[in-house]
Structure formats: C-alpha cells, structure tokens
Design a protein with these regions (language model features):
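Conserved C-terminal structural/oligomerization subdomain of aldehyde/semialdehyde dehydrogenase
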Residues: 83-168
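ALDH superfamily catalytic-core signature
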Residues: 1-93, 144
Length: 168
C-alpha cells in the first residue's frame, strides 16, 4: 500500500508574496491526483489579506474549487465553507481546503491533527521559523520554499514509483 497524502503548505507571515503563487499552483495543480499534491493551504493571518487573493485567484483560474474556514472566506468570498472532513480529505482532485492560522504553533497543530505524515511545506523568509518547522513537523518529507510535489521516487533517485510508500 502506498502512503495517503494529506499534504499541507503553510504560508508564514514572512513569506515572499512573489514566490507564493507559483509554489502553491505547482503543489496543487501540476498533478492533483498524486499523493504528494497539496490538499490544505494554511496561511498566517498577518499575510492572508495580501497573499490569499492572489493565490486564490490563480487557483480558481486553474480550475481549483476552494473550501475555506470563516476567516479565509471573509478575505476571498468565492469559496465554499470547509467542514471538518475537508481537513482530513485526500481529494486527489482540483479541490483545496484553505485555513487562516494565528501562528506557526497553530499551523503545526493543524498538521499534526489532520496530516498523514507524507509531505509538508513552509513558505518563509525567516530562517529560524523554517528551522522550527523542519524540527517540529512529523512527515517523511519536509520542504522550505518548495512544492510538496518534489516527493517522488525519481526525484529522490529511487527510480520509478511502483507502490512506493513515502510515509514515515
């Protein structure tokens, strides 16, 4: 059995807005049916008003259906309301859950509760915050300023994927 992939990308308050859109688009739309595709986007509240509209518009332009918490829907109204089951969903489709968080601790708690230990990513320019994310998140592959889509047998130099589990 291969690993389930409820993969997250966390956009930290210090994230470079210019890098957010291309990384998020790749993580969700490059191959949405893959187990390493992002299923939930977490955004720090301080950067959400600036970053979420740009990211959400780009996702919608790529055909992604968005499901957000109340705070996300207040910033970008063109999304459905997320239910608890959305946070645990491996959609394997052009559907993405979006949640606004107050801190790195809240993002890590969300990942710990709903993640599957497959692949997690943080977008940040703060080295200490990146190190803390790397140290504290429990996943087989953890990225800084990169797409979760890099978790791949070929990219890791392991050859073709035939039911390779990348879970811890």
């Amino acid at each position: 059995m291969t690993g389930d992939g409820v993969c997250h990308t966390y956009i930290a308050a210090s994230a470079d807005p210019e890098m957010c859109v291309p990384i998020v688009i790749n993580a969700k739309t490059q191959r949405p049916s893959a187990c390493n595709a992002m299923e939930t986007l977490l955004i720090h509240k301080d950067v959400a008003p600036k970053v979420l509209p740009a990211v959400a518009n780009a996702l919608v332009a790529h055909g992604v259906e968005l499901r957000g918490d109340t705070a996300a829907r207040e910033i970008f109204a063109d999304m459905e309301s997320a239910a608890d089951e959305d946070w645990a969903a491996e959609y394997l489709d052009l559907i993405l859950s979006v949640k606004i968080v107050n801190s790195l601790d809240e993002a890590l708690a969300h990942i710990a509760r709903w993640g599957t230990g497959h692949s997690e990513s943080i977008l940040t320019t703060d080295y200490a915050e990146a190190e803390e994310f790397l140290d504290r998140v429990d996943a087989a592959a953890v990225y800084v300023n990169a797409s979760t889509r890099f978790t791949d047998g070929g990219v890791f130099g392991l050859g073709a994927e035939i039911g390779i589990s990348t879970q811890k």
